[in-house]
Amino acid sequence: MLDTNTLNFIYDNKIRLVSKLKNFSKKQIHLYITTVQQDEINKMMDDYKKRCINKIISIIGIRRVLTLSSIKAIDEPSKYEFISSNIGMYELVEDADLPFLAKLQRYTASNPVGNTADLIILYTAIKKKMHYLITDNTSDFEPMLREMSKFISNYLQVQKNYYLDYL
């Protein structure tokens, strides 16, 4: 699973990385993003960057997976997070996981997570037993993983984006 910031890293280094990443599928290594991340890309104001990232996704063969979430709804048109119906973008979480996900979604001083989109992207990677490729900035990611690990066992293998330099 690619962190959204990793897509920006690939975009910034596209000349060097796209051809290398394109060969992953030949080695039976697949890259994924969630439907939430695709929605974030589609909301970008910079049309050139949006088209370029979508083209990179297509060239590399990045696959989209449904996001695991406890919420299915139609958001109001004025709400910034989603611009249309998000039914069909999600799979429901396991009932046993609902209490801790609800707790993690509440931002408090003792709960640094707060970002629901990042939380459900991470949860999706854990439940689908994927590696998670992140940028060098782990300040958002580490507290989230630490908190989530208190409630759900995971075998998430985290790779930082400098791993891409060795391809």
Feature names for model-found ranges:
Residues 111, 122-167:
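Acidic, PIN/NYN-like endoribonuclease modules and their adjacent C-terminal/linker elements
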Residues 1-64:
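Short, well-structured N-terminal submotif of metal-dependent ribonuclease cores
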Residues 44-47, 51, 91-93, 108-112, ...:
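Short, flexible/disordered intra-domain loops and linkers
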Residues 69-132, 138-139:
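Active-site neighborhoods of divalent-metal-dependent phosphate/nucleic-acid chemistry enzymes
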Residues 56-60, 64, 72-74, 112-116, ...:
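Extended interaction regions within the primary functional domain
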Residues 39-41, 68-79, 161-167:
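A short acidic, often aromatic-flanked loop/helix-cap motif at beta-alpha or helix-coil junctions
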Residues 32-33, 67-68, 151-152:
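Alpha-helix boundary/capping detector
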Residues 6, 37, 120-121, 139-141:
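Alpha-helix capping/helix-boundary segments
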